[in-house]
Amino acid sequence: MKRNIPAHIVMPRNAPKVKIQAVEGYRANITLCEPTLKARRETLEKIAEKTGAYVVHPFNEPKVIAGQGTCAMEMIEDIGDLDAICAPVGGGGLMSGTCIAARSMLPNVRLFGAEPKGADDAYQSLKKGKLIPQNNPKTICDGLLTSMGENTWNILKDHLEDIITVSDEEIVTAMKLIWERMKIIIEPSCATPLAAVLTPEFRELENIETIGIILTGGNVDLSKLPF
């Protein structure tokens, strides 16, 4: 149902062209800003003040976290019992929602996050026991470049067993596997959890046979495939 409510989307200037075109396709109002958290926040505040729009944070908003948790909920409803679930971690919204939904439905399920080695702020945060901001990330996974928020961090630190980091090379291998064997178009960020599950580190874990992997997005520029 169309409600004719305008949507204002703040995006970094270096956002992939395919993502900008997708937002334009939904007729949203795009405002580009410098690719920093400070610039995004300031631009968002200016737009909200000017238009009176309700601000929806992309991952730290509780309603967004709840909505993303339905991915895990539907997977468990369809498959049933799982030994473990793995999902990518960027801002942490999807992983947080996954933790809450999965833990309420399968109390003993083991929860793992997956991150690129070149953007491993969540991994560093979990190991050090405090929120570590992202610092100069370098990875092909443009969807996982942002830092976690306070809300997502507080959820993840209480529920994740571990975060497994993978190289861009491992991510590309996993991405190719999904394209070729499953015939699904995914972006590099989406391949991160499969890459994590394929690592010796994960394979050496005991008592894990049935694994749920959440595939998160296909915003890929076909002219710039990494393989």
Show where each model-derived region lies.
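PLP-dependent amino-acid enzyme catalytic core
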Residues: 1-227
